[in-house]
Amino acid sequence: MDQELDELFSLLMDEEQLLPIEELSALSDLDTRQLDRFSSCWQSLSPQRRRTLLATLGQQADEHVELLFDSINCLVLDDPDPTIRKIAIGNLWESTDPSFPAAFLTALNEDSSIIVRSAAADALGRFVLLTELEDDSLTESDQIVDDLLRTIRDGASSELHRACVKSLGFSSREEAQVIIADAYLSEDEDLVQSALIAMGRSANPVWRPEILQELLHPSPLIRAEAARAAGELELHDAAQSLVELLEDVSNEVIHIAIWSLGQLGGDVARTALLNIQASAPDPETVKKADEALEHLAFLEGTPDLLIYDFDDSAEDAVD
């Protein structure tokens, strides 16, 4: 392993070469001694090489669940480059390690960079959700919501404000609901999008009227988030509006409407998904319809024949 790491470090420090993607798995789950050696290598890398490496490690962890780079991400949480700190927090977003909320709260409250504070606010949303799911191991649960609320009340920048609103969507506290409502009623389109994301995360059907209304909004960005929220909250009376969005001018809106119909299920959703699966002009939309129909079949406990290729079957019969 030591020789493998030495070879990898040499490759990383040769910045005229592309990152050795296949060899990066050697950085997974480093022990303390190995992490010290990585730190020495890290210090010799240029800022751009560091950013590229850390972002690539995040991508590799997403694609290969057996890879764990948490120790490296934790190591660089105090890197002088704010972009590195932001990437590291993003890479740790899915971790439920109980030691991370304190680090993210420190970043939210004390970091000098708005992009880092915003990343921390985003990451804290996962721990708000865990609290709502009655995870008693999170001792900072009240402080997380309190600090997100306080950050907004202290006049956060637009980017940070939006991140806090989205994370507060996971909270059932009344103050959080007020913040979401205020964001929705603002005249800031970006903030309205964040409010709709928060509504979808809330598991609270109280937001049904707002979501149904925004499915008709002139902005495709607003329509997209409303469509997503309708699926997340399983608003069955949104089905017909979602079907109409399958003819939207925006591919993003179409794809999210497809996903949401798969979440809703029912005859209306199934018929619409089968129709677009058969008639969509591009492979990506067909793929989205396939996935939604597979999910719908899973929800309804029906036989999943959707991946059966009838054309191939016919050819086999002829042969």
Task: Spell out what each predicted region is.
Residues 274, 278-319:
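Eukaryotic acidic, Ser/Thr-rich intrinsically disordered low-complexity regions
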Residues 58, 93, 125-126, 169, ...:
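Structural signature of alpha-helical solenoid repeat scaffolds
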Residues 2-7, 30-43, 63-78, 97-110, ...:
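Amphipathic alpha-helical scaffolding segments comprising HEAT/armadillo-like alpha-solenoid repeats
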Residues 53, 57, 123-129, 173, ...:
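Hydrophobic residues within the alpha-helices of tandem HEAT/HEAT-like
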Residues 18-21, 51-55, 86-87, 102, ...:
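Alpha-solenoid HEAT/ARM repeat scaffold
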Residues 17-18, 32, 47-51, 82-83, ...:
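Alpha-helix N-cap/helix-start positions at coil->helix boundaries
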Residues 1-65, 297, 306, 314-319:
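N-terminal alpha-helical scaffold/docking segments in eukaryotic complex subunits
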